[in-house]
């Protein structure tokens, strides 16, 4: 049968002609085009020198730990429920005694101004605006007091590495308490630094050195270098200056003799919530909870310490079944989407922590980039909850998620 054709009329075309107002702000246009955290990663890689990008992006040795952690979140199957009214969805609840708008917070990251000159202040501002906690690292490039002055609002946590000099460690704890931080994350998975081979190959130093390689790299990233050279010198705000690599500094300053017995001593010195970060076995989770901490973080340090370490997401349901009624469980490593966060909550986490996802946003566009990263995750959390047929986090449960493990059946860990 022949198709009848006619000459298009202007009035027929008019409804189809839709022109968006041009966006002349290149940063807004660039960030607005990012729909996923991986999109932000691609932007970050283009805009940041290789050594700085690799410091955030890389892991230990062959980087199998981080690859397996990400695969763990890919290898899940959701089980949605249907015909539920999901007009209104609430993605917040209490975490460690205080309300949070979303079930994730910003993880502690070291040397953050290396990635973007706005550094920790950008992360804290974005977190405060979103109603989620921000964690400041012992290896921060912004002083404790300076962060509070710049961002007086919002909930702040502090991540503590124990030093060989315990008096200096406790002096730092007292500063954190005086500044109004409410939670201390004691990191326990760094007796020595992991072998971060990208940093070694890139000649990563503190502060960055102007070698032939970095000068050549600077030619492709003039804005980054301009920011570095025209702002405060890049250094660890709470530590002494050091001419070597980050790993060498860790091995010189941090205490490899920390044991379970030290937790009670730390708890006696700290008035707020105490959380132990770096739990990788069920036995260790039991031992830490028995010592009266307020929470634990299942973490392999973002795959930056022991390569081939356990996947925290795989460990989560086993720890939650046994200890979920006795402590609050947080989890990190490999989280790149709102669906990842929802899966973790369904399997027993109270909160998740984002590290690289936050840093990709920071490198892509400073504070605006962090806002965009949080927005992407928030949108994903709420969309996934609606598609699962739940209206609040309390309705999520293991029946909504099945883990499909490529390394073999998931047995009960010890």
Swiss-Prot record:
The active site is at residue 301. A 2-oxocarboxylate binds at residues 55, 161, 196, 304. Gene3D superfamilies: Aldolase class I. Pfam families: FMN_dh (PF01070). FMN binds at residues 137, 159, 187, 277, 332-336, 355-356. It is an enzyme of class 1 (oxidoreductase). Residues 29-406 form the FMN hydroxy acid dehydrogenase domain. PROSITE patterns: FMN_HYDROXY_ACID_DH_1 (PS00557), FMN_HYDROXY_ACID_DH_2 (PS51349). GO terms for cellular component: peptidoglycan-based cell wall; plasma membrane. The keyword Flavoprotein applies. Its cofactor is FMN. Keywords: Flavoprotein, FMN, Oxidoreductase. InterPro entries: Aldolase_TIM, Alpha-hydoxy_acid_DH_FMN, FMN-dep_DH, FMN_HAD, FMN_hydac_DH_AS. Its EC number is 1.1.-.-. GO terms for molecular function: FMN binding; oxidoreductase activity. It catalyses: (S)-lactate + A = pyruvate + AH2. Belongs to the FMN-dependent alpha-hydroxy acid dehydrogenase family. Was identified as a high-confidence drug target. This is Putative L-lactate dehydrogenase. It comes from Mycobacterium tuberculosis (strain ATCC 25618 / H37Rv).
